[in-house]
From Swiss-Prot:
The gene is groEL2. HAMAP family: CH60 (MF_00600). It is found in: Cytoplasm. It comes from Corynebacterium diphtheriae (strain ATCC 700971 / NCTC 13129 / Biotype gravis). It catalyses: ATP + H2O + a folded polypeptide = ADP + phosphate + an unfolded polypeptide. This is Chaperonin GroEL 2. GO terms for molecular function: ATP binding; ATP-dependent protein folding chaperone; isomerase activity; unfolded protein binding. The lineage of its organism: Bacteria, Bacillati, Actinomycetota, Actinomycetes, Mycobacteriales.
Amino acid sequence: MAKIIAFDEEARRGLEKGLNTLADAVKVTLGPKGRNVVLEKSWGAPTITNDGVSIAREIELEDPYEKIGAELVKEVAKKTDDVAGDGTTTATVLAQALVREGLRNVAAGSNPMGIKRGIELATAKVTEALLASAKEVETEEQIAATAGISAADPAIGEQIAKAMYAVGGGKLNKESVITVEESNTFGVDLEVTEGMRFDKGYISGYFATDMERLEAVLEDPYILLVSGKISNIKELLPLLEKVMQTGKPLLIIAEDVEGEALSTLVVNKIRGTFKSVAVKAPGFGDRRKAQLQDMAILTGSQVISEEVGLSLETADLPLLGRARKVVVTKDDTTIVEGAGDSAQIDGRVNQIRTEIENSDSEYDREKLQERLAKLSGGVAVIKVGAATEVELTERKHRIEDAVRNAKAAVEEGIVAGGGVALLQAAHVLANDLDLTGDEATGVKIVREALSAPLKQIALNAGLEAGVVADKVSHLPAGEGLNAATGEYVDLMAAGINDPVKVTRSALQNAASIAALFLTTEAVVADKPEPAAPAMPGADEMGGMGF
């Protein structure tokens, strides 16, 4: 395909125009009085949202240079969302401010490489100051406040905080997995799973012990884990007899249990001779093997597998795991208080953490995170309902962002919200970090841009942006504008805070993309295809001659 090329100022201005188009659409959503944006869908109802990254993803521009500029800023929003789960609009506003000031100076004759160096040094200094001023999250109320701001609903913030403590047994669990699911009811409900749950239920309904609730409850059972299929009862019989002598029930988790092995277990359960439940192992391939190994470590058992030289015929009671209780429904199985060795469980948890850090796939990371939570505490499910499909989609997305926001707060701490932390961190850039020339210009550009998020929040709240920024810059650290009420308060005390991870990620990603914009000397884009010629004799009625 033929290409078109733009150089110097033309190239940079084309990119900037695309950036501004996207940023102007996104920044109206910033702050407690931010507006919504309606996104048309190719099918179904439109989406109404105030989530920066969702809006950015939908914007496709026609001009090839503008399109590239918009794509670069989308990357800022996406990267910030991936790292911190929030702060996408703040990152976009910062990027726009940095690029606008930077291009003005480049057009006036400044050296882009000098400005880039100044921006990088200033960003590193401000990041350092933000991390130093961050306060550790210590209470459920602080998490509720942070998540509530992100979700724009204090009640949702409270549910998220409750979930993070519930899966840790009353303590804050940093590894907690909180999933958000759609519900047919109105409002937001929290469901906490104690222990390890996986989404496979009993193979036969005859295994149920509670016919009203259609679930099988096994108290203090033995747990048999098998990596292959079980179909021959002769293989299983010696082990079944040993378990029967103990008077304990048995949970069998295998790739499948079928044929005479399954029918024998069912018949013994119906007669009341022996209580057991057979369940298919979750997952496929290597992921199934890994989950079986997790269960083995959690319950103190050994996976019966030919790979390690173990077979069902020779299996003995010491190879079986134990748990205080197992609850099996038609859809899922929950193992409560497995009898595994705590040192081995900790070792497995650390191994999974390392795998998460080394994984490049978002999907793999998500699955590893779920395994980690099941081993180290439990899983909470927030069920969300709404009156319409549009509202449900928007609400679910907000809650998912708020969950990630709360986790970011627990990870690195919190700073004053409302754009105040960035503005007040600008004091570390006094004297231009003792730099000179274009590097000092780069520092000035960052110092100026740090007020942009606060100014936009004030603007969206109908206030005079310059006046607000000037007043906040003279207030004590941590005090600033509560845009919801228009009052100047101690933001941390009022529960208006942001995770420092969100704030620093927004600045770092915005600075990174701004440096790329300023040092761009040429843009190569696909040449637009010429429009197809009209059909001969076509008229206004669609070219069909009607």
